[in-house]
């Protein structure tokens, strides 16, 4: 190869090495984002729950509940920086055959989040149950590269963010996950009018404070930020004017089903694979290939520099050259003879 071939290989190898460095530092952060077309349904179950039967205005115990949460991305409302989710949650009484009566609670939510940090952002007509509301903190996912620290996590029922504290690292569904816990201390979330008899009052209608408390535990795959398992110990009660709990609206320990955990684990593995491709596999391949090209190029350049052409032979001159004294062939030398008449005759012969 010519020297220029080696130089081209060195340049190409250098370019690949630069690409190997830039991919995890520049390219990956630009591509690793929360997807706009998010679509998932998670199912949680609770055993032996207590709920308020609004038909009979009495508590029912030993009830099995199922909660369905559907998350759908509003692609048109999202962009490079934000994703918008529409969320619906419905809790039903498994034992109630009448579909219209089996519903225990229902809620809707619309939230916009930063596609890189997963933090809520003020945008896009966000609301809770149709009423405009500004979210804060994390909502339905954790950030890529979740750390062992405390995050602010939004509670839709309390309508504020609470500290979700890192507790431990565990194994779940074949994944290493971070366990976070957050506590919603008892808080009044509304006031409603109810029959006085419900609160033990003789009045026909009374005001009742609706109170809420929750202990939420989340198991998060740290690379992807996917919540592999969620669990809530939720309590809602009605209180009378003295602040005493009179009746339970819901008292349940809801947790992701095994199937939902497997579904979430698969989503985490898929996301982690894409992240690993951009942050590890591609940089390593580019770096090694670039290094090989540089080494080959340097070798070719050095070899070409050492193999300079020999000096061209000088063409023989057409004219004969005189022999050096040492090279002359010995020839017989004739001794000069003295002219007749001796020396004087010789002298006379000169003009």
Region locations from a protein language model:
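Short, cysteine-centered beta-strand-loop-beta hairpins and adjacent loop/turn segments enriched
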Residues: 92-98, 186-197, 208, 237-244
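Cytosolic juxtamembrane regulatory segments of multi-pass membrane proteins
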Residues: 48-55, 319-332
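Juxtamembrane interface at the cytosolic side of transmembrane helices
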Residues: 2-5, 274-325
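Long, low-complexity, intrinsically disordered segments
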Residues: 323-351
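Membrane-proximal extracellular "stem/stalk" segments
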Residues: 198-280
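Solvent-exposed coil/turn segments that connect beta secondary-structure elements
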Residues: 46-48, 183-187, 235
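Membrane-proximal low-complexity regions enriched in glycine and acidic/polar residues
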Residues: 139-231
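Extracellular or lumenal secretory-pathway regions
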Residues: 2-148, 254-279, 299-304
């Amino acid at each position: 190869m010519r020297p220029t071939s080696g130089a081209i290989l060195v340049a190409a190898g250098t370019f690949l090495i630069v690409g190997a460095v830039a991919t995890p530092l520049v390219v990956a952060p630009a591509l690793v984002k929360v997807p706009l077309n998010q679509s998932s349904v998670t199912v949680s179950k609770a055993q032996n729950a207590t709920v308020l039967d609004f038909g009979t205005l009495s508590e029912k115990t030993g009830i099995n509940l199922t909660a369905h949460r559907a998350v759908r991305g509003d692609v048109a409302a999202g962009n490079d920086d934000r994703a918008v989710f529409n969320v619906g949650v419905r809790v039903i009484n498994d034992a109630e055959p009448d579909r219209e009566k089996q519903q225990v609670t229902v809620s809707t939510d619309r939230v916009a989040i930063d596609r890189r940090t997963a933090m809520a952002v003020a945008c896009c007509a966000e609301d809770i149950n149709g009423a405009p509301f500004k979210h804060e903190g994390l909502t339905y996912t954790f950030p890529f590269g979740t750390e062992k620290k405390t995050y602010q996590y939004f509670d839709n029922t309390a309508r504020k963010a609470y500290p979700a504290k890192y507790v431990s690292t565990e194994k779940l569904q074949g994944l290493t996950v971070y366990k976070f816990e957050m506590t919603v201390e008892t808080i009044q979330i509304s006031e409603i009018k109810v029959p006085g008899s419900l609160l033990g009052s003789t009045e026909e209608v009374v005001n009742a404070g609706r109170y809420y408390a929750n202990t939420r535990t989340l198991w998060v795959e740290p690379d992807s930020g996917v919540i592999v398992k969620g669990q809530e110990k939720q309590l809602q009660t009605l209180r009378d004017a003295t602040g005493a709990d009179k009746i339970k609206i819901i008292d349940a320990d809801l947790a992701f089903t095994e199937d939902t955990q497997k579904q979430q684990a698969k989503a985490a593995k898929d996301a982690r694979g894409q992240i690993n491709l951009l942050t590890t596999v591609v940089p390593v391949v580019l770096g090694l290939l670039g290094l090989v090209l540089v080494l080959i190029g340097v070798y070719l350049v050095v070899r070409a520099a050492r193999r300079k052409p020999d000096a061209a032979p000088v063409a023989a001159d057409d004219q004969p050259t005189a022999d050096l004294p040492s090279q002359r062939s010995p020839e017989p030398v004739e001794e000069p003879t003295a002219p007749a008449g001796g020396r004087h005759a010789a002298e006379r012969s000169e003009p």
